[in-house]
Design a protein with these regions (language model features):
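Short, charged/polar, Gly/Pro-enriched secondary-structure boundary elements
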Residues: 56-59, 93-94
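A generic structural signal for short, non-catalytic loop/turn and secondary-structure boundary residues
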Residues: 42, 68, 80-82
């Protein structure tokens, strides 16, 4: 494994741990906790975190997650079905 890949792997693990611990504190209504979740590395430089089947999410909740992930993170919320949305966060790995 290259040094860059090892650093990225460590950073991804740190982001996943920080997100799990942070959501436990800021998501009392379980809007994101327990939802289908996927991670995808984009070009080895960014980590996309996607939550599916989210019943709805307030801007304040998105801002809370962004505080956990870091200020360089950005988010999109898109309709998935009439009753749910998909929430994506993208975090730089560098």
């Amino acid at each position: 494994m290259s040094e860059r890949a090892a650093v990225s792997s460590e950073r991804i693990t740190a982001i996943q741990q920080r997100l799990a611990e942070g959501l436990a504190k800021i998501d009392p209504h379980h809007r994101l906790l327990g939802r289908p979740l996927s991670y995808r590395v984009i070009d080895g430089r960014m980590l996309e975190i996607t939550y599916r089947d989210v019943a709805g999410i307030a801007e304040a909740e998105v801002l809370g997650v962004k505080r956990i992930l870091g200020r360089d993170c950005y988010c999109t919320v898109a309709p998935q079905t009439a009753e749910s949305v998909t929430v994506r966060f993208v975090v730089p790995l560098e």
